[in-house]
């Protein structure tokens, strides 16, 4: 991540939570890095020691981690569901990895949970690319057939009053 600052003097517990991110990506390249711009990936790797990020800028990532942890716990109670499992496949000597949020074996559906803004209510191309790589990884790991890809968006800035006023606005905080 580079250098982490705390210019707003946030409590040490928040700093510790941000720095205690267990995500490593695994393999040579993760699904999200694979679908990212090569230029962004190369420059980020080349200059990672020069990149400075403030703890306050990581709050939404922290919230996303919390949501994924809660959903993983819930998934443990469900039969025929794989949750938060990291998958790997070799591609020409590169170990590609990706983590599925929820794979429903019986319905052949792969769900990905995104904590996001209402401004992304229609999703993004990167979400579609990520789900397709995860679909491929699931097939490579156990031969799972996936016929449905689903993004479950959790809108951190949802406003019910806006939903009542505007039919094109998301009608629920989770869709």
What are the residue ranges of the model-derived segments?
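Metal-dependent nuclease catalytic regions and adjoining charged, substrate-binding loops involved
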Residues: 1-8, 92, 137-175
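Metal-dependent nuclease catalytic cores that hydrolyze phosphodiester bonds in DNA/RNA
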Residues: 1-110, 117-129, 153, 161-163
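Short, surface-exposed linear patches
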Residues: 55-57, 132-134, 171-174
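An active-site-proximal "capping" alpha-helix that borders the catalytic cofactor pocket
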Residues: 127-140
